[in-house]
Amino acid sequence: MNKEYTLLDLYEIYCEAMPRYPLAYERFRDILHKDNSQIFTAESSETIIGFVVVNGNSVVILCVKKEYRHSSYGKHLLIMAEGFISASYDEVVLGGGGLFQGVPCDEGEESSVPFFEKRGYNADFTSVNMGLTLNEKSVQKLKEIPRPDGVTYRFADDNDREKLLAAVKDAQADWLPIFEENKDAPVLLAVCGDEIAGFEMVEEYGGMFFSDNEKHGMIGCVGVTHKYRRRGIGLAMTAEGSLSLYERNCKDIQLLYVERVAWYNKLGYEVTSRQWMGRKKIQDIMF
C-alpha cells in the first residue's frame, strides 16, 4: 500500500461501497492487520480509488469508489490479488469468511456477481445471513416456542468437554475443528438425563456487521445429535440461546452461513443479506 494513504482512507472507501455491511473502524483495522494480509491499491495522481485485501487464498475485500466503477480499476485490483495468490495456492476464493463469506448480492443493490462471472468465477450456492432485533415483541415470540419435556438447557463447563466433542462428531463432524480450536467459546447445551442432545455457540460480542457501541450477539454451529432429532430440541435450544443474549443486553443477534432459512423464520429471524460463494481454479486465470 502506498504510504501516502492511511487505513482511514481505505475505511472511508469501504463505508461508501458497503453501506449494508457496517463495520466499526477498529474492526476494519483488525481485519486489514490480520496475520499475512496483503493490501493492494488503485490510485490516480490525486487520490486512492480502490483497494483489495488478500489473506491466504481469499480475496477478503475488493472496493472501488462509486465514481470510478466500470473503469477497469476493479479488474486490475483483482488481477493483482490473483497473481499474489497464484504463487502459493491453486484456487482463489472470494470472501472466505475473514469478513464476507462470498460476494454480496443483495436485492435492490448493484451486484458484483456478473463482474466475477465474466472473469471465470463460479459458485455452487448463495450463502444467507439472518438477524433478529431483540425487543419485547421478538422476545415474546421466543418465549412462546414449545420446550420439549425432559430437556434442560445450560452452558457447558470444562467437565462437559469430552461429551460435547462426541456430540459434535455425531451431529456434524465437520464442525469438530471449530469446537476444538475455540474451546473457550460459550456453548449452550440441551441436556437429556446425562446425555448432551444438542449444542450451539452463543457469543454476546460475536456480531460481525455493526458500527455502533452496542452489543451484537451471534449464534452459530447449532446441532442436535441423531438420537434426539425431530423433537423440537434444536428450535427450543436456539430460543433459549437467543433469550440469553437478550438478558445480556444485546441489541440484536446475527447468524452467518444459514442454510435452514424457514427454520429460523419460526423464531423470528429474517434474512439480512446474501452472498455468492464464488471461487476459481488458478489454471483458469489468465495473466
Segments the model singles out, each with a brief description of its role:
Residues 21-44, 48-61, 169-224:
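A conserved beta-strand-loop-helix scaffold within acyl/acetyltransferase catalytic domains
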Residues 50, 125-128, 197-198, 273:
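A structural microfeature
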Residues 58-71, 98, 219-229, 259:
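A short, internal acetyl-CoA/4′-phosphopantetheine-binding micro-motif in the GNAT/acyltransferase core
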Residues 79-148, 278-280:
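Acyl-donor-binding surface of acyltransferase catalytic domains
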